[in-house]
């Protein structure tokens, strides 16, 4: 009986936490699906295809395109 109560409380807590931390529950999925559909129609728009600078290449601290971190204008 105690285990059942603990499980119910845990499920309710996790459900409430999911709704509380959601970005935009009103149209979040609609935007997500439209972005995914756009990326399927235009593969160049996918963020997975973006190039990043490798280790030791020059970078801008504010607009970093490094694969790792940009420290003192050099990618690490």
UniProtKB/Swiss-Prot annotation:
It is found in: Secreted. One of its GO terms (cellular component) is extracellular region. GO terms for molecular function: ion channel inhibitor activity; toxin activity. Residues 23-50 form a propeptide. The keyword Signal applies. Disulfide bonds join 52-66, 59-70, 67-75. Residues 1-22 form the signal peptide. It comes from the Eukaryota. The keyword Secreted applies. Expressed by the venom duct. Keywords: Disulfide bond, Ion channel impairing toxin, Knottin, Neurotoxin, Secreted, Signal, Toxin. The presence of a 'disulfide through disulfide knot' structurally defines this protein as a knottin. The cysteine framework is VI/VII (C-C-CC-C-C). Belongs to the conotoxin O1 superfamily. This is Conotoxin Vc6.3. It comes from Conus victoriae.
């Amino acid at each position: 009986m105690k285990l059942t109560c603990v499980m119910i409380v845990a499920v309710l807590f996790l459900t409430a936490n999911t709704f509380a931390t959601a970005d935009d529950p009103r149209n979040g999925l609609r935007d997500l699906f439209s972005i995914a559909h756009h990326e399927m129609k235009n593969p160049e728009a996918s963020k997975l295809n973006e190039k990043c600078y490798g280790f030791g290449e020059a970078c801008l601290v504010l607009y970093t395109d490094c694969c790792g971190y940009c420290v003192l204008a050099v990618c690490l």
